[in-house]
Amino acid sequence: GDTETAQFIIPSEKTTVYGNDTISVTISRDYTWEKIGTADFTDGIFTGAAATVDVKKAKEGTNLYKFVAPMRTLYKQNGETTLPGGVDLIFTMDEEGNITMDQGIYEVESGTSLIEEGNASLYYACKQYPDMCFFDNNNGVITLSTLLAIGEKLYGPYTWTFDWNNGYPYAAK
């Protein structure tokens, strides 16, 4: 992934006393992903079911990884025909296996009968809720602890577990 930043500057004679006279816009190009392994995913939020998901790494020399569409894959492997969106779980992992993910709201469950009130999203706010939103990596068994947002309410914490048993780059020898 490449990024480019452009700055737009408003001439001083056209600005007001409030607001910004400069706006920066960053444009990102998607990464090239290559499959490096698989992980056994267990959904501790909605179903308790398990599935095998692909693990991919960005080829552009980063420590950027993703678990590919865990909920969609789980539904498909368990014979469901109504599938949620295919949201990937993207994260960085350093050479010691420490994992970080951008804070944010990630829609993971929509279009199925599990959520009657609409869409459900992972509400990952590790700065605001450090005891409830975090990653734990025990030699490739990765647990995501997160809150769940349905409408305007938060629930949890809940966990997703990924046993990265095929292709984990930092396995103990």
What are these regions (language model features)?
Residues 9-10, 43:
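Short intrinsically disordered, low-complexity segments
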Residues 2-8, 140:
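Exposed beta-strand face motif in extracellular beta-rich ectodomains
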Residues 26-173:
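Ser/Thr/Gly/Pro-rich, low-complexity flexible regions
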Residues 10-14, 148:
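Surface-exposed loop/turn motifs at beta-strand-loop junctions within extracellular Ig-like
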Residues 13-22:
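Short, exposed coil/turn segments at beta-strand boundaries within extracellular/luminal domains
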